[in-house]
């Protein structure tokens, strides 16, 4: 019985390795990374109108992926709100939600508006292009449209400010 289990585990491992390798080949080059040109997108916002990344051409832009059920995202909201209040006019902060309904997000944003732009990536198409694997995730895009930072986890107001200032050239 132990030989059978051992052979089965080896087969599963081999199939898994081939599956991972195949997936890597298929998805290679299909997402952006630090140092790449940011993928331009057009997504709906809270009022239903569309916002494009190119609307912010020539500005340092911060993208933050979040979810309403995400505890670290909720902890991060006061820091994001403080950044938006203190630096949002100079460095736009765009909040992107993937896969949740507008009604659900409206409940969250009522407490955390602070003039932030909230966008909806319903089918996670843009999230996949940006290689978003969780939330919160933050991207800093420089004035030339290049992704300069990709950070997984909650951020602070000062982290955001320091990144934005660093790429404000």
Predicted regions and their residues:
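N-terminal targeting signals for export/organelle localization
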Residues: 1-40
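Short loop/turn microsegments at loop-to-beta-strand junctions
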Residues: 38-39, 61, 135-136, 151
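Short, internal strand/loop/helix patches
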Residues: 94, 106-144
């Amino acid at each position: 019985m132990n030989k059978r289990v051992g052979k089965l585990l080896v087969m599963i491992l081999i199939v898994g390795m081939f599956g991972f390798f195949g997936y890597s080949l298929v998805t290679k080059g299909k997402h952006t990374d630090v140092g790449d040109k940011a993928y331009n997108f057009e997504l709906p916002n809270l009022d239903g109108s569309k916002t494009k990344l190119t609307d912010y051409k020539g500005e340092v832009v911060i993208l933050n992926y979040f979810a309403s059920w995400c505890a670290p995202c909720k902890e991060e909201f006061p820091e994001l709100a403080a950044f938006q209040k203190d630096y949002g006019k100079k460095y736009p902060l765009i909040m992107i939600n993937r896969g949740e309904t507008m009604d659900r997000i409206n409940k969250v944003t009522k407490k955390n508006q602070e003039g932030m732009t909230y966008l909806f990536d319903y089918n996670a198409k843009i999230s996949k292009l940006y290689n978003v694997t969780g939330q919160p995730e933050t991207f800093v895009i420089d004035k030339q449209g290049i992704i300069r930072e990709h950070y997984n986890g909650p951020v602070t107001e000062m982290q955001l400010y320091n990144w934005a200032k660093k790429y404000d050239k």
